[in-house]
Amino acid sequence: MNFKNLSIKRRIVYTVEGFADRLFTPKYNPFYYLGTICAFLLVLIAISGLYLFFFYRTSSPYETMQSITVNQWYLGGIMRSIHRYASDGLIVFLILHLLREFLLGRYRHWRWVSWVSGNALLLTSILVGIIGYFLVWDERAQMIAIKTAHLLDDIPVFIEPPPRTFLSIATMSKMLFFVLLLAHVMISMLGMGILTGIHVSRNARPSVKPPKAIAVTVLVILILISLITPATNALPVSMTKVPVDVPFDWFYLFIYPLASILPKGMFWAVAVGGTIILFIAPWIGRPKRQPTAQISPEKCVGCEQCHKDCPYEAIKMVPRKDGRPYLFQAEVISGSCASCGTCVGACGSNAPSLPNRTMEQIEEEITKLLYLSRKENGRASIVGLVCEKSVNQREFIDIKNSSIKGMPNVSVVTFPCAGMINHSVIEHAIESGADGVFVAGCQTGECSFREGSKWAQARL
């Protein structure tokens, strides 16, 4: 059995989430719904952005946004503010989501697609946000244009040096703002939509909606902020002077102070190098992957239950070729398999198995532990079927006799995930002499393999 202590990174996450559990209750702990909150914010951004799109005019960007904010303060102004603050919130929750998955180690092996697409979504969001600020064409937009032009000055692809281009009123044409508006809309709607689809593509039944209470709370907070501190224009652009003191959004524009502090070569090295490391993190020092699940065709009856329960769509049904009287048989997609054992718990004919943790080994272990417990303690024995990721095993489990510390009559058998447990395991424990059986898995929203606790509860 695997008796490893929790890493420092996991301790950080569980400490923060434990505090949030006490504050919000586990059912409404926002840290369990970071991804779905991001999806909800994207919906709010799309709705408010669509409203602004109908009123935006590329011939007079500043005047348009000023009119929406002032003349329509009761609706247009609120929509603009929600668009702004929901976008800020998106960056915050994307970073929290990525940071949580990194600290929990949930970005390697079969999860690399979600990690890479998630980082791409973060960078794309920042790009879209910067373009959005440009579309207002106030002093803040002018500063962004100048700073961006200076960053691009070393790239030899421009006929005219970028800083001079952005400082020329002649280049600030209606066509330029049309192109920027098109880029803002297309990248946000099409690009981010595709990335979001890729992000959840390997998850069965992806969760994209937060609990109603959390969604309502987020919306109310955004509306209150919009009323208390509405998003407004900075001063109009003046081509005769360079803007100095302008309102600043650190969530999107943080790269510009960083570029001002660091030498240009070092800035590009940090930016490009950091981005590359972020994207290749799943392959840096990753631990050995656990053997993936295997299917015994002779036991498979084509019921599709393992295919339906798999949290990562790592099992597909293929036509049978062995002449048995079933249309299909299950087949594991190794690259997507998490080795969680959910398919093992789903099957009534024992067709799936984990090479390093078979049901035969588990049943033999249960029988042995119950025999030794009865022999040594001479009293009732209880068996705990425990997800190895749901507890700090070194803290709670006595390694020598596989029991809970201070409770020698409570034997513990660990599983890769609670989703591997089904009624047959419990029946075996009872038939082997257990006076009681309990199952311990991850709490709601916290399952390392997404749906283990859900399936364990449903099967029992």
Annotate each predicted stretch with a short phrase.
Residues 10-13, 19, 23-54, 63-83, ...:
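Membrane-embedded alpha-helical bundles of multi-pass integral membrane proteins
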Residues 305-338, 342-365:
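Iron-sulfur cluster-binding cysteine motifs and their immediate structural context
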